[in-house]
């Protein structure tokens, strides 16, 4: 475990790799990761552990845990899904991640940060004009995950002071207002 959240991903992975290469009979055991997020590296360390031989991860919904928290289930699930080349399938139905996150948040009375990866309110919200235009042209320009894959209906194009014409036209279209080219 990285109980203090101190390790860098390279260090954590090296520890797992060392055990895999130097402990007799280690393949009869299941090495597990248990990382804390004191330096914001719990997910990266967990993934490094998995890449180097750990076959079990100890994670929590929303990263809830001691001090700065533990590795976030939703981050690990979606990171492994995005990096299919690793050949690791969790078997988890990711479409329930957002609803489970919100349920845990409500029951624990622990709000989820708006900018929390995967399940935060702003995880699929775009407020900058260039990002909005890019997402409206092709979601893949600025989103590596389809919101539907985590149980959301769609991305949010928020009208802000940083929005551009594309976002305004998009909003007007949603409202059924059609502008002529010169407007």
Label every model-predicted segment.
Residues 52-69:
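Glycine-rich phosphate-binding active-site loops on the catalytic face of alpha/beta enzymes
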Residues 12, 42, 97:
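Aromatic/hydrophobic pocket-lining residues that form the small-molecule binding cavity
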Residues 13-33, 78-83:
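Alpha-helix-loop-beta-strand connector modules within alpha/beta enzyme cores
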Residues 4-20, 67-75:
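Active-site-adjacent beta->alpha loops and helix N-cap segments on the catalytic face
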Residues 39-54:
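Catalytic cores of alpha/beta
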Residues 1, 29-35, 57-59, 76:
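Hydrophobic faces of well-ordered beta-strands that scaffold small-molecule active sites
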Residues 2-7, 35-41, 61-65:
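Active-site-proximal loop/turn and secondary-structure-junction residues that shape catalytic pockets
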Residues 78, 85-183:
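A mid-to-C-terminal "edge-of-domain" accessory segment
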